[in-house]
């Protein structure tokens, strides 16, 4: 929204001569920093009030898994739905600092709010029923897929229209380590993109099981994709690195700046012992947001590297469930895999910090693919 002030100075001589500082709003880097600080400030200021309100309204808070580690029972009574704080920071900050005429920004916010609403309803059912069983799995996935498909459709059409006539770039998948090889999926790209976004949302959701475990890797992924979005949206940098130039995606760096700021604010309250959990409200929204940016920038496969920790968590659940159905035995002591390490004797802080380290290493590997071609 603030970028419009800079555009206003192009048409009104008074603004262009007396308010030259408005030109700062043209720069993505400046607005990214502004979005970061704004979202962090929003969460810091309103976080305590939101936590107090949720604690009163929820009573017993988020239910604790009966088969989980014994150390988790001391967390009983901790309120959930802390994702509301994160969403408030991201959305308000993005509305202020991002270009709302940008299709990629609108699509990303659509997925973020849509997935956040689904997660909120899931959290609401869990709290009111005092059960870890919330929204019907199939219904939830169906709604997520519809929202994601709508976003991907509009992003794909935007990419197709911004390219040369006859270009299939918008409906194609790019591969790391290859300069020009792309696989055109046609309209099936909508299904592929939606699958990526839904998978990302649920992978982050599965990771959110310990204090601070999910939010820091999310910020690491957001920072990584902030760099990717900025480079992919800049022709000079994209040409130099031989990555796909996607006009308009640089604006997503502003939204990702808001994610980092909101994440920092939330971590202040989520640091162990957590005063609040983000719940599905936050984890689904954040994962969906990262997935949408990956699809927009044509770095879906790179996301599997940068977000490898989330992939590992999701795979551990898939393997555990699948193997148990076939053999009635378990591969892990408990899934997702962070609980497996708790059962092995790692303290919660050891699991969290070591997983953070893994997330940093994977992000560095993922970013290195931008140059290794």
From Swiss-Prot:
Keywords, ordered alphabetically: Cell cycle, Cell division, Cell inner membrane, Cell membrane, Cell shape, Cell wall biogenesis/degradation, Magnesium, Membrane, Metal-binding, Peptidoglycan synthesis, Transferase, Transmembrane, Transmembrane helix
Reported function: Catalyzes the initial step of the lipid cycle reactions in the biosynthesis of the cell wall peptidoglycan: transfers peptidoglycan precursor phospho-MurNAc-pentapeptide from UDP-MurNAc-pentapeptide onto the lipid carrier undecaprenyl phosphate, yielding undecaprenyl-pyrophosphoryl-MurNAc-pentapeptide, known as lipid I.
Gene (name only): mraY
Cofactor: Mg(2+)
EC numbers, comma separated: 2.7.8.13
GO molecular function, one term: metal ion binding
Location relative to the cell: Cell inner membrane
Protein name according to UniProt: Phospho-N-acetylmuramoyl-pentapeptide-transferase
GO terms for cellular component: plasma membrane
InterPro entries associated with the record: Glycosyl_transferase_4, PNAcMuramoyl-5peptid_Trfase, PNAcMuramoyl-5peptid_Trfase_CS
Membrane topology: Multi-pass membrane protein
Source organism of this protein record: Rhizobium rhizogenes (strain K84 / ATCC BAA-868)
Annotated CDD domains: GT_MraY
GO process terms (BP): cell division; cell wall organization; peptidoglycan biosynthetic process; regulation of cell shape
Predominant cellular place of this UniProt entry's protein: membrane
Leading EC class: transferase
The reaction(s) this protein catalyses: UDP-N-acetyl-alpha-D-muramoyl-L-alanyl-gamma-D-glutamyl-meso-2,6-diaminopimeloyl-D-alanyl-D-alanine + di-trans,octa-cis-undecaprenyl phosphate = di-trans,octa-cis-undecaprenyl diphospho-N-acetyl-alpha-D-muramoyl-L-alanyl-D-glutamyl-meso-2,6-diaminopimeloyl-D-alanyl-D-alanine + UMP
Pathway assignment: Cell wall biogenesis; peptidoglycan biosynthesis
